[in-house]
Amino acid sequence: MAILDFGSQYSHLIARRVRELHVYCELYSCLVSVEELAAHNIIAVILSGGPSSVYEENAPHVSKGIWDLLATRNVPLLGICYGMQELAHVFGGQVAPGQKREYGKAMVHRIEGCNSTILQGLPEEFQMWMSHGDKLHQIPLGFKKIGTNSIIY
């Protein structure tokens, strides 16, 4: 598994949690080269959070070559915070500033009827930590919303 780091203070914690599940993972910069990732048998990718906004001029973005590589290999993706916004931004969704920043504990609610394997073993509602100022206004075509929080600005 590869974790692409967009500057989150929690990227190492994400990697540790994945390893605690006995899954081998490596932490890479979000600017990793296609050649470096292609040299590994990547089974899944997590895109971390980060302090930027995807629509800012100098925001970090994964290269198109990486997206092509992952699509060719049919690699599942999980975007967390900025990582989710990066996926939406790249694949035709809409990300914009929220009405106000969100910071602190929040409850995630699984979408009723969702049988995504990524949430397998988790309760219908669980606590998470959030820190962001942007909002996903439109999900990209072909993507599926599997959870939400009740704090939406």
Please report, for each region that a protein language model flagged, where it lies by residue:
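Cofactor-binding loop segments of dinucleotide-utilizing enzymes, especially the Rossmann-like FAD-
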Residues: 4-6, 30, 82
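Cysteine-nucleophile active-site neighborhood
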Residues: 16-22, 38-121, 126-127, 133, ...
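Short, charged N-terminal beta->alpha structural module
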Residues: 1-21
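Hydrophobic anchor at the start of a short beta-strand
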Residues: 1, 25, 77
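Conserved Rossmann-like nucleotide-cofactor binding loop
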Residues: 9, 33, 85
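Short, Gly/Ser/Thr-enriched beta-strand-loop segments that form substrate-interacting elements
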Residues: 142-150
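A short, well-structured beta->alpha microelement
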Residues: 22-38
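Short beta-strand segments
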Residues: 3, 130-131
